Curated annotation (Swiss-Prot):
Keywords: DNA-binding, Nucleus, Repeat, Transcription, Transcription regulation. One of its GO terms (cellular component) is nucleus. Residues 1-20, 199-245 are annotated as: Disordered. GO terms for molecular function: DNA binding. It is found in: Nucleus. It comes from the Eukaryota. The lineage of its organism: Eukaryota, Viridiplantae, Streptophyta, Embryophyta, Tracheophyta. SUPFAM superfamilies: DNA-binding pseudobarrel domain. This is B3 domain-containing protein Os11g0197600.
Length: 406
C-alpha cells in the first residue's frame, strides 16, 4: 500500500488544523495487512512504513484493537526510528485470538486510537476461532488430575485466557494454582493428503454409534520403528537422574494436582541450561518446521508453564479439532527413545480446545524439556502420539528440582 506524501511547505496555524482534520478524514477507514512470519511478530508487530503517513496525527500510547465481534483489547502503540509498533498488550491479543505464524491480519484504522483487526488463515479464509475470542480475564476452569478426576483450577493472574465451561458430574475436586496460557507461543498444524487418521476420527464421531470401538495401542517396537527426521537426543532417558527427580518420576514426590490442598509444596523445575540466543531459538523452530510425515502433526514451542512449573500444556487448536478425541481420555505419548508415557488429555467442548494435564509433567521432566525447545506431536495411531524433540541447546543439562512453599 502506498500513501501519497503530503506536499507543500509550512502552513499557518488555521491551515494546519484544517489540514490535520483533512488528513484524519482521508486516513480513517484505510487498511493495511501483515503476514506474521517470525516469533518476534507475535510479541511486537511493526506497522508497514507506507502506512506511517496515516498515523502522523495519531499520538503514541494505548490504542484499542477490536475484533469482528466488537471485543476490545488494549495495546501500546510506540514509534522509533524504524516506524510504528504494537507492543505491550499485543502479545495478549495474539494469545487470546490463537494467532499463529503464517496467518495474516488485516488492520483497519477506524478512528483515532482504534484499529479493527480481522485474522485470516494461510488459505485466505477468515479465521473461525476469532469469533469466540474474548479479552483475557481471571477465570476458574476444570482440569484433570493424575488420578483421572477433575481438579478445580483457581486462576488469579491477570491476562489469562477466556473462561472454559466446567465438566459437571465429575467428583474428586481439589484446588490448585494453574499457570495457564500465560506464555502460549506459535503453533503450526500440518496435515498430509495421505493421512487418514483425522478423517477416520471425524467419521466415527459423526456416526453417533452406540458402542465405543476398541482402541488399538501402539506397541513399543512399532513406535520405535516409525521414521524420524528430527535431531532428537538419544541420551535424555539414559542421563543419570538426580535422586529428587527419580522420586518425582516414581510418584513419591507429591505432584501438582494434590499439593495445594495438602498444604505441601508445588514442584518447580529449575533450568541449568546456559542462556540461549534468539538465533538458537529460531534455529530450533526452523528444524522442527522441516519435519515431514504422512501422519498429521502439530508443532508447539515449550514455555515455562509447560516444562518448569504447572506442567499444563495447551495443544494447537487445529490439531485438537481435526485429529484428537472430543472427550476427556488417556493418551499415550511416545518419546524419542520409544518409551510410552500415559497422560491425561482434557477436552473443552465449548471452544474445541484441548490440553495435556496429569502425566505431562512426568513426560516433560523425564525428557528434560526446556523453555523454547520445540516439540512435534505426530499422531501415529489413534490415541498414540509420537513426540519429536528439537532442542535449542543440543547438550542436555539435567534440571534441578525443588518444592516451593505455597
Amino acid at each position: 500500500m502506498v500513501v501519497r506524501e503530503k506536499q507543500g511547505g509550512r502552513m499557518g496555524k488555521g491551515k494546519g488544523k484544517g489540514k490535520e482534520k483533512e488528513c484524519d478524514i482521508n486516513c480513517f477507514g484505510r487498511s493495511f495487512f501483515r503476514v506474521l512470519l517470525t516469533l518476534q511478530s507475535l510479541e511486537r508487530m511493526k506497522i508497514p512504513s507506507s502506512f506511517n503517513q496515516c498515523l502522523q496525527n495519531q499520538p503514541t500510547g494505548m490504542v484499542s484493537l477490536v475484533d469482528r465481534s466488537g471485543n476490545k483489547w488494549s495495546a501500546e502503540l510506540t514509534s522509533d526510528s524504524e516506524g510504528f509498533f504494537f507492543v505491550h498488550g499485543w502479545k495478549e491479543f495474539v494469545r487470546d485470538n490463537s494467532i499463529q505464524c503464517g496467518q495474516f491480519l488485516v488492520f483497519t484504522y477506524d478512528k483515532r486510537s482504534q484499529f479493527s483487526v480481522t485474522v485470516f488463515e494461510p488459505s485466505g479464509i477468515d479465521k473461525i476461532s476469532t469469533f469466540s475470542a474474548h479479552p483475557s480475564k481471571n477465570v476458574i476452569i476444570k482440569t484433570e488430575s493424575d488420578e483421572g478426576g477433575m481438579v478445580t483450577a483457581a486462576i488469579t493472574t491477570e491476562k489469562m485466557a477466556p473462561a472454559l465451561k466446567e465438566n459437571n458430574g465429575i467428583t474428586g475436586k481439589r484446588t490448585r494454582d494453574v499457570d495457564y496460557l500465560m506464555e502460549d507461543r506459535v503453533v503450526v498444524f500440518k496435515k498430509s493428503s495421505e493421512a487418514n487418521v483425522c478423517e477416520s476420527s471425524r467419521r466415527k464421531r459423526a456416526g453417533a454409534s452406540a458402542g465405543k470401538s476398541k482402541v488399538t495401542s501402539t506397541s513399543h517396537n512399532s513406535t520405535r520403528g516409525s521414521s524420524c527426521s528430527s535431531d532428537e537426543d538419544n541420551s535424555s532417558s539414559k542421563s543419570p537422574n538426580p535422586p529428587f527427580l527419580m522420586r518425582f518420576l516414581s510418584g513419591e514426590v507429591s505432584r501438582r494436582g494434590r499439593c495445594v490442598s495438602k498444604g505441601q509444596r508445588q514442584l518447580t523445575v529449575i533450568s541449568q541450561r546456559r542462556p540461549v540466543t534468539e538465533a538458537e531459538k529460531d534455529h530450533a523452530l526452523q528444524r522442527a518446521r522441516e519435519f515431514k510425515s504422512k501422519n498429521p502433526f502439530a508443532v508447539q514451542i515449550m514455555m515455562e508453564s509447560y516444562v518448569y512449573v504447572g506442567f499444563f500444556m495447551n495443544i494447537p487448536c487445529e490439531f485438537v479439532r481435526e485429529c484428537l478425541p472430543h472427550t476427556n481420555k488417556r493418551i499415550t505419548l511416545w518419546d524419542p527413545q520409544g518409551k510410552a508415557w500415559e497422560v491425561n488429555y482434557v477436552y473443552y467442548s465449548d471452544r474445541s480446545v484441548g490440553s495435556f494435564s496429569g502425566g505431562w509433567g512426568k513426560f516433560a521432566v523425564g525428557n528434560n524439556l526446556e523453555k523454547f525447545d520445540v516439540c512435534v506431536f505426530e499422531l501415529v495411531q489413534k490415541d498414540n502420539i509420537k513426540v519429536h524433540i528439537y532442542r535449542v541447546v543440543p547438550e542436555i543439562t539435567p534440571h534441578k528440582l525443588r518444592s516451593d512453599p505455597k
